[in-house]
């Protein structure tokens, strides 16, 4: 024992020297990559500023944006061994989105996405492989498919709205909407994506696993047993396995000639039709691969929709004239007492309500950044080249407040047929991405938001519980109001729709 201590004591100076040398090299590497970009001159060894990010992501990212505002739209930092660049300028962000290819930039979906999602995710496909998969996804979002989903969305929404009315209506007790909306969206996603293929027990397990994934996506990326990140990775594996079983069941059902009733059915129906025509099975048509792609849909839809629905309630309450116009438009087209769901044609008529939905997404884009990794050195400007291995964060949020008329004002009329700012400032409307990896389900997502706005505003009166900073942004992992959108609810109608 004494011998071991003496050996350690003799080696200690060398170990300390080696550690200090490593820290010095790390700092010098950071400064060389940073060059003249604004950003911290010193970063904590190894972990960088990851603790600041995890402790208060809102403050961290706003600080990056402010720092980038002092330069041509760029700011540097360091996170767990990775040099990062925050991109505030819209045109510089377009250079990233327009150069998603093997030799330039790879999307990540999450700063440590490959560890979390695995390599098979749609996010990480490129070239012909990516084009082929997206082409086979097209049947999932035809007008017929979207109309089928619309009915399912409304049925789930009405069931949850009825529960809210029974539990919280009366206007005497405030309720935080975050968990209510999250549960609504999770059931909607399950029902629309895999419908009849999940029993009650599977749905409960599904919810538990998704919550573990959600928590882990916000944690430090420590992939060891007992840590939240590791639990999230295991939850993803469980979710993908569950979804792959659903894919197999759907394939068998579609092979019998039955009509599609959910997203996986439309997808598998197209696969079965192609194979019956004598073509080989499409790429990534194995049950396991489809399970992974279905999880991509779930990840893209779930938290983004939760964010948008919460902000919609927030802004409708704070803009009574907008709320009044929504109610007036919806009442002319659909009545809760009609005994019918909103049809596809009626949904298309709700032009102002759709403009409100688009403005909600512009004003508070759910995913504020879209991280990519540079696979090679990339000359971004005349004076700065992004080093290979850098994680870049093009800011969708900052782009939303550039170009548009009075961008800091919540103004749905900017999307009217008269002003058409969605076309005039199209390059600044990046909430659904840009280029080859643009969101394939954006029409579904907007329909979901429009349906919720129409139904919620028709069925409920609502008043926010005002508190200091209630509208401040927090990340969980998409952005939402700090107070969880806490409101007083009271019903507007005498009888609840019986649909």
UniProtKB/Swiss-Prot annotation:
The tissues in which it is expressed are: Expressed in the vascular tissues of roots, shoots, stems and leaves. Expressed in root tips, carpes, siliques and seeds.
> Which cofactors are named for this entry?
heme
Check the record and name the Pfam families matching this protein.
Answer: p450
Could you name the domain of life of the organism this protein comes from? Eukaryota
What are the UniProt keywords, alphabetically? Heme, Iron, Lipid biosynthesis, Lipid metabolism, Membrane, Metal-binding, Monooxygenase, NADP, Oxidoreductase, Steroid biosynthesis, Steroid metabolism, Sterol biosynthesis, Sterol metabolism, Transmembrane, Transmembrane helix
For molecular function, the Gene Ontology terms on record are: C-22 sterol desaturase (NADPH) activity; heme binding; iron ion binding; monooxygenase activity
Biological process (GO) annotations held by this record are: sterol biosynthetic process
Catalytic reaction(s) noted: 5-dehydroepisterol + NADPH + O2 + H(+) = ergosta-5,7,22,24(28)-tetraen-3beta-ol + NADP(+) + 2 H2O
Disruption effect?
No visible phenotype under normal growth conditions, but production of brassicasterol is abolished.
Q: EC number(s)?
A: 1.14.19.41
Membrane topology reported for the UniProt record: Single-pass membrane protein
What pathway is this protein said to act in by its record? Steroid biosynthesis; sterol biosynthesis
A Gene Ontology cellular-component term = membrane
State its location(s): Membrane
Q: Identify the PROSITE patterns for this entry.
A: CYTOCHROME_P450 (PS00086)
Q: What InterPro entries does its record include?
A: Cyt_P450, Cyt_P450_CS, Cyt_P450_E_grp-I, Cyt_P450_sf
* Family according to the record: Belongs to the cytochrome P450 family.
Q: What else is known?
A: Plants overexpressing CYP710A2 show higher levels of brassicasterol/crinosterol and stigmasterol, and lower levels of 24-epi-campesterol/campesterol and beta-sitosterol than the wild-type.
Per the entry, what this protein does is: No activity with campesterol.
What protein am I looking at? Cytochrome P450 710A2
- Tell me the lineage of the source organism: Eukaryota, Viridiplantae, Streptophyta, Embryophyta, Tracheophyta
């Amino acid at each position: 024992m004494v011998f071991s201590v003496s050996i350690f004591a003799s080696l200690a100076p060398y170990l300390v020297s080696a550690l200090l040398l490593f820290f010095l090299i790390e700092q010098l590497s950071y400064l060389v990559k940073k060059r003249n970009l604004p950003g911290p001159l010193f970063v904590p060894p190894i972990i960088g500023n990851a603790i600041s990010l995890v402790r208060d992501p809102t403050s961290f990212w706003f600080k990056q944006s402010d720092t980038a505002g002092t330069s041509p739209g760029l700011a540097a930092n360091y996170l767990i061994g990775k040099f990062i660049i925050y991109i505030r300028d819209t045109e510089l962000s377009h250079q990233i989105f327009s150069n998603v290819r093997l030799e330039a930039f790879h999307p990540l979906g999450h700063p440590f996405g490959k560890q979390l999602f695995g390599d098979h995710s749609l996010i990480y496909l490129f070239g012909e492989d990516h084009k082929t998969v997206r082409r086979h996804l097209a049947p999932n979002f035809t007008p017929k498919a979207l109309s089928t989903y619309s009915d399912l969305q409304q049925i789930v929404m009405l069931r949850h709205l009825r529960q809210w009315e029974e539990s919280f209506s009366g206007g005497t007790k405030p309720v935080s909407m975050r968990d209510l909306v999250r549960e609504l969206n999770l059931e909607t996603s399950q029902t629309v994506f895999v419908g009849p293929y999940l029993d009650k027990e599977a749905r409960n397990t599904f919810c538990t696993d998704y919550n573990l994934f959600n928590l882990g996506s916000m944690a430090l990326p420590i992939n060891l047993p007992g840590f939240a990140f590791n639990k999230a990775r295991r939850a993803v594996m469980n979710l993908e396995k569950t979804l792959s079983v659903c894919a197999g069941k759907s394939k068998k059902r579609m092979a019998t000639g039955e009509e599609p009733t959910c997203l996986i059915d439309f997808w598998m129906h197209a696969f079965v039709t192609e194979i019956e025509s004598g073509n080989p099975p499409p790429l990534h048509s194995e049950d396991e691969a489809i399970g992974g792609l279905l999880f991509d849909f779930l990840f893209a839809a779930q938290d983004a929709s939760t964010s948008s629905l919460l902000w919609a309630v927030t802004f409708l309450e704070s803009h009574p004239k907008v709320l009044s116009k929504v109610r007036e438009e919806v009442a002319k087209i659909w009545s809760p007492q009609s005994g019918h769901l909103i049809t596809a044609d009626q949904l298309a008529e709700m032009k102002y309500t759709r403009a409100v939905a688009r403005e909600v997404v512009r004003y508070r884009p759910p995913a504020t950044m879209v991280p990519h990794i540079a696979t090679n050195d990339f000359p971004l400007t005349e004076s700065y080249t992004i080093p290979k291995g850098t994680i870049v964060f093009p800011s969708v949020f900052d782009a939303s407040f550039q170009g548009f008329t009075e961008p800091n004002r919540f103004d749905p009329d900017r999307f009217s047929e008269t002003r058409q700012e969605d076309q005039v400032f199209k390059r600044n409307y990046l909430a659904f991405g840009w280029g080859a990896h643009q969101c394939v389900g954006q029409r579904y997502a907007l329909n979901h938001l429009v349906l919720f706005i129409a139904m919620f505003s028709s069925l409920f009166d609502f008043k926010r519980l005002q508190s200091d900073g209630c509208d401040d942004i927090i990340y969980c992992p998409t952005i939402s109001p700090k107070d969880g959108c806490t409101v007083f609810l009271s019903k507007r109608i005498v009888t609840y729709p019986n649909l």
